[in-house]
């Protein structure tokens, strides 16, 4: 039995909400993936605050209709598609998809859209290679800590150097 008009409108509304929160959308060809494999992908994406939706291309077209941020997605809406919508850590979401695809070798990314711009395969891979927010914060904290340590050592070195010079002068004066 087909979907009712009300049901379709509900799906389009849900897609619009997800797109409003998303920063990045990836379009995957999910042909050949089992339900278990799709569930595995969804579980992996949950950790990066991302969702995977399988819906008809016409419903996604209606969801992006009139939204300039997502209008370019229309060119990718052919065939059997799953849509990965990434809200939080974009790099982690893309990494989760790429790890899944490497392990299964069944699915491929057709393309993506980030800030209204279509992404090539190379650009998507570059996003996955970026460090996560946690890694960046750790690097920044390490850099700040290193500067503070150098300042502390430098401040401590002035009196120590003065004390050594005075001691050397005093010892030199006795002889």
Curated annotation (Swiss-Prot):
Source taxon at top rank: Bacteria
Signal peptide start-end: none
Keywords: Ribonucleoprotein, Ribosomal protein, RNA-binding, rRNA-binding
Nucleotide-binding keyword on record: no
Any Gene Ontology CC annotation: ribosome
Record's keyword annotation contains Ribonucleoprotein: yes
Molecular functions per Gene Ontology: large ribosomal subunit rRNA binding
Gene3D superfamilies: 3.30.70.1730, 6.10.250.290
GO BP, sorted A to Z: translation
Protein family per UniProt: Belongs to the universal ribosomal protein uL10 family.
Subunit composition and interactions: Part of the ribosomal stalk of the 50S ribosomal subunit. The N-terminus interacts with L11 and the large rRNA to form the base of the stalk. The C-terminus forms an elongated spine to which L12 dimers bind in a sequential fashion forming a multimeric L10(L12)X complex.
PANTHER family on file: 39S RIBOSOMAL PROTEIN L10, MITOCHONDRIAL
Functional description taken from the UniProt entry: Forms part of the ribosomal stalk, playing a central role in the interaction of the ribosome with GTP-bound translation factors.
Protein name: Large ribosomal subunit protein uL10
